Regions:
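Membrane-proximal amphipathic alpha-helices
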Residues: 22-34, 49
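N-terminal single-pass transmembrane signal-anchor helix
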Residues: 1-25
Length: 188
């Protein structure tokens, strides 16, 4: 009788323990993604824009010099995943890999969330309604960064139950731009 009970309970216990471990792993991955996104958007608000049409979309109107800029979320400059517009490759490499050379040392997104690629990131700049026409530091925009991944795979439970994993939720982090410059003075 004891052997029969053991044969029934043992697989259930292994499954329950595996589920707890893999759920913890899933939460760990979500936390890594959230931290990477926080770092990424923070870097974007103090760096040169990565979208190719930023200067065209947010060009100042010289006839309205000194006038306040209206908030208009429909005025956007977007690049990255799902947009069909490629972000600046050098800036994206720097954002993902970081810059650990010279006097500038900061980690990239991959240091916090290994496996992240430029193809999973979407970056959106939109008018925030702050600032004025002709502002020396450029327009004040809202910077939004999103990451999209397919699913989180469960190594043990996924194979046992033949599941495809749990969909990774889209992470969106938003911040208001500061100076949108990567270096002091003119960048070369």
């Amino acid at each position: 009788v004891a052997l029969t009970e053991g044969l029934i309970v043992f697989p259930i216990m292994v499954l329950a323990i595996s589920l707890c471990v893999e759920f913890g792993y899933m939460m760990y991955q979500w936390n890594l993604a959230a931290k990477a996104m926080q770092l990424g958007v923070r870097k974007l608000v103090v760096s040169e824009p990565v979208t190719p049409d930023f200067n065209t979309v947010f060009a100042f109107d010289d006839t309205q010099s000194g006038q306040l800029i209206d908030a208009d979320a429909s005025v956007q400059s977007t690049c990255g995943a799902g947009t069909g517009i490629a972000c600046d490759a050098a800036m994206m490499t720097r954002l993902i890999s970081g810059n650990l050379t010279g006097g500038q040392r900061w980690p990239g997104l991959a240091n916090y969330f290994p496996g992240i690629t430029a193809g999973q990131i979407r970056i959106i700049y939109e008018l925030s309604g702050l600032g004025y026409q002709g502002r020396p530091g450029g327009p004040v925009v809202t910077v939004r960064m999103e990451i999209g991944r397919d699913a989180i795979d469960f190594p043990v439970i996924g194979r046992l139950l033949e599941s495809i994993g749990i969909a990774f939720p889209p992470f969106t982090v938003t911040a208001t731009s500061e100076d949108l410059r990567s270096c002091p003075g003119p960048c070369s």
